Amino acid sequence: RSATKNWDWVANSMELAEQGMTYDLGCDEILIGRHASADIRLPDLSVSRYHAMLTVSNGRWTITDIGSKSGVFVNGNLVHEAVLHENDIIKLGNRRLVFRKRRDERVR
């Protein structure tokens, strides 16, 4: 159905943004952390090497704490796992990221 395609488009058109940096969410599983192997690398000692995992399923993005020391906060609430919505504020250590629609809407 077209609804499924629409959800796929929504999932593929999201990004994380912080202080002038943007991170495309171009695959269905994204590791966030300080380690060099992280898909989104945040080189900050307040961020764990393997801090959180972003996954998308049926058009919904979920963030999961994967054993971080400082926790994952969504809109100020400490969570183990949470479904993300547009403009949610994600705090990992001292880093603050916004989950939003991509600013450069490229045609795919």
Regions found by a protein language model. Give the residues of each.
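Intrinsically disordered, low-complexity acidic Ser/Thr-rich regulatory segments
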Residues: 1-43, 55, 104-108
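Short acidic/polar mixed-charge low-complexity motifs
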Residues: 19-21, 38, 59-60, 70, ...
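Loop/turn elements at beta-strand to alpha-helix junctions within RNA-recognition modules
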Residues: 30, 45-48, 68
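General beta-strand recognition
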Residues: 31, 41, 55, 60-62, ...
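C-terminal boundary/linker segments immediately following FHA domains
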Residues: 67, 73-108
